[in-house]
């Protein structure tokens, strides 16, 4: 399970070190794509196959399903970790996530999220509801 929070700095070429704990779980190759809330999602190749299978079941007749699939897949790239434990985040994905220098990696069960430090701090400090309120709403889902 992917969990925890780590901070790293992106270099001038757009490369960033993937935390060692996440490298163990993700493997040498994985998929990086546009995520929700102005972050990036990282999936192991195995988990990406599960995501692809779910996307294939979305009805082509639904406008939202087509739009989501396009958004999600158009930004997807397969990444390989270099000898220094880094990946290159393409410019279009850095732009989507507003990543310029400092990044936050967050383990979220089956994926890693990569956030601009500034965007993460704003998101986590300005959430309209508290953690307790969110947990209360999820109680209805037996979580």
From Swiss-Prot:
Pfam families: MraZ
Stretches assigned to coiled coil: none
Gene Ontology BP annotations: negative regulation of DNA-templated transcription initiation
Location relative to the cell: Cytoplasm, Nucleoid
UniProt cross-references to CDD domains, sorted A to Z: MraZ_C, MraZ_N
Organism classification: Bacteria, Bacillati, Bacillota, Clostridia, Thermoanaerobacterales
Molecular function in Gene Ontology: DNA-binding transcription factor activity; transcription cis-regulatory region binding
Name the record gives this protein: Transcriptional regulator MraZ
């Amino acid at each position: 399970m992917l969990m925890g929070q780590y901070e790293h700095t992106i270099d001038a070429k757009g490369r960033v070190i993937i935390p060692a704990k996440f490298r163990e779980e993700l493997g040498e190759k994985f998929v990086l794509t546009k995520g929700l809330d102005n972050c990036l999602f990282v999936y192991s190749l195995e988990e990406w196959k599960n995501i692809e299978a779910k996307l294939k079941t979305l009805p082509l007749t639904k406008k939202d399903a087509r739009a989501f699939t396009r958004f999600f897949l158009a930004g997807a790239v397969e990444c390989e970790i270099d000898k220094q434990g880094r990946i290159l985040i393409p410019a279009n994905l850095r732009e989507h996530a507003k990543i310029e220098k400092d990044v936050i990696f967050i383990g979220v069960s089956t994926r890693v999220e990569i956030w601009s430090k500034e965007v993460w701090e704003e998101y986590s400090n300005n959430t309209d509801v508290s953690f307790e309120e969110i947990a209360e709403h999820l109680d209805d889902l037996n979580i």
